């Protein structure tokens, strides 16, 4: 049995390193607005993206470059130049949505495999066959595809790799084909600048056809409703069914623009879930509790296991997003000697340490604080908050950009967190 690949988002170089250190087999990201994430695209330059590719390859891991926007005629020359520049960086694949761009990429860089973006909305064998014949090596399935349909496609096209999303935000529209943001904000989703208008609260109005009078329908709270707001996808409880099907080559986590902790925690938990499957030690309740430490819109298992008409629980009408069960207080620097404060942090408080896969944490006690283990979890308690410039504090807030000294080095890219909700 070939082990499934775990693919994590890389919104910038730091998140790329975090995802790989927390157990991702590969990451995906891009440069410029052609990558369908304007903000994330701006956080990578050609130079830092190349640095990320080299970093991944040194770990025997992969980087897939996103070129999955839908270009207009006026952009085609720039697109051609962009593909050529990206090919020089030697990514392990291009993720592309438009068939014309697929053909262009194969012409410019025939040695780089093509992964078809979920934006292409492949839902059936006929479409899969067309793209396979075009030269696509892997299809990132539409979120609306069922597992049974994926199995049928794999049986018919055994050399075609299938990738599915297992976690992250879901669009209200059909796999991202949405114009709400373009109409209301002039920001076009399929060119990478979605304003997430589906997350806003809206008010209902009715119109009298006789006189044109508009009347607002007042909800019980009187504050509108999140009528378009889709819950977040979470398939951590279905890893056994997915991997037992032998149809899926890669599990993908959404979230290039989300936090560093999100990149770490989702990768950490899905890495654990995949490894547990192969060792027959699955712990779905643990995965669920850990994923609830993240900000989310409520979770749904989407449409992979059940069809859309069979369920009415994929939306959250109450709120655009909810805080997670844990608060991130600090991010450990890459050299492991300091942490950056992300939330109010005080002395004599125990902060749980979340560390990369297989990282070693050594207990220690000294004048700055102690690092210890309790019930298979590691914690940090600070006796004093000593900044990098040797200023001593009893409390530090997130607005303070000075790094804080640790009692002893911790694994690079670790996090400090506290529970805020049981």
UniProtKB/Swiss-Prot annotation:
In terms of InterPro entries, this protein maps to: Peptidase_U32, RNA/ubiquinone_mod_enzymes
**One of the protein's GO biological processes:** proteolysis
Keyword line: Hydrolase, Protease, Signal, tRNA processing
Read off the Pfam families from this record: Peptidase_U32 (PF01136)
Q: Which GO terms describe its molecular function?
A: peptidase activity
Q: Does the keyword Protease apply?
A: yes
Task: Please tell me whether the keyword Hydrolase is annotated for this protein.
Answer: yes
Signal peptide location: 1-58
Q: Which family does it belong to?
A: Belongs to the peptidase U32 family.
> In its UniProt entry, what is this protein called?
tRNA hydroxylation protein P
Q: Which gene name does the record give?
A: trhP
């Amino acid at each position: 049995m070939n082990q499934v690949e775990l693919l994590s988002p890389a919104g910038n170089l730091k998140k790329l390193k975090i995802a790989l250190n927390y157990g991702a087999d590969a990451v995906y990201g891009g440069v410029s607005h052609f990558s369908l994430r304007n903000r994330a695209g701006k956080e990578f330059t050609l130079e830092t993206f190349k640095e990320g590719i080299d970093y991944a390859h040194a770990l025997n891991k992969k980087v897939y470059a996103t070129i999955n926007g839908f270009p207009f005629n006026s952009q085609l020359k720039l697109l051609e130049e962009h593909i050529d520049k990206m090919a020089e960086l030697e990514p392990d694949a291009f993720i592309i949505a438009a068939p014309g761009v697929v053909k262009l990429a194969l012409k410019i860089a025939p040695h780089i495999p093509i992964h078809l973006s979920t934006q292409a909305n492949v839902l059936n064998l006929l479409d899969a066959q067309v793209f396979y014949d075009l030269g696509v090596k892997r299809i990132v399935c539409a979120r609306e595809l069922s597992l049974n349909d994926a199995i049928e496609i794999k049986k018919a096209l055994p050399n075609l790799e299938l990738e599915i999303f297992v976690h992250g935000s879901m669009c209200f529209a059909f796999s991202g084909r949405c114009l709400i943001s373009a109409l209301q904000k002039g920001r076009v989703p399929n060119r990478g600048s979605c304003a997430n208008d589906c997350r806003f609260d809206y008010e209902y109005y009715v119109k009298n056809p006789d006189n044109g009078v508009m009347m607002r329908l007042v909800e019980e709270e009187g504050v509108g409703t999140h009528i378009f707001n889709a819950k977040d996808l979470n398939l951590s409880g279905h890893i056994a069914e997915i991997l037992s099907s032998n149809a899926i080559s890669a599990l993908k986590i959404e979230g290039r623009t989300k936090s560093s902790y999100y990149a770490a925690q989702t990768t950490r938990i899905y890495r654990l879930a995949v490894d547990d499957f192969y060792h027959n030690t699955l712990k779905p309740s643990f995965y669920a509790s850990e994923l609830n430490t993240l900000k989310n819109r409520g979770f749904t298992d989407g449409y992979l296991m059940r069809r859309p008409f069979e369920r009415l629980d994929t939306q959250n009408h109450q709120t655009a997003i909810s805080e997670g069960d844990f608060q991130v207080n600090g991010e450990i620097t890459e050299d492991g000697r300091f942490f950056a404060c992300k939330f109010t942090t005080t002395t004599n408080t125990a902060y749980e340490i979340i560390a990369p896969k297989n990282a070693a944490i050594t207990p220690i006690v000294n004048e700055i604080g102690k690092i210890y283990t309790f019930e298979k979890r590691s914690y940090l308690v600070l006796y004093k908050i000593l900044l990098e410039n040797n200023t001593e504090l009893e409390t530090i807030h997130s607005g303070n950009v000075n790094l804080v000294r640790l009692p002893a080095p911790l694994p690079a890219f670790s996090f400090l967190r506290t529970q805020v909700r049981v």
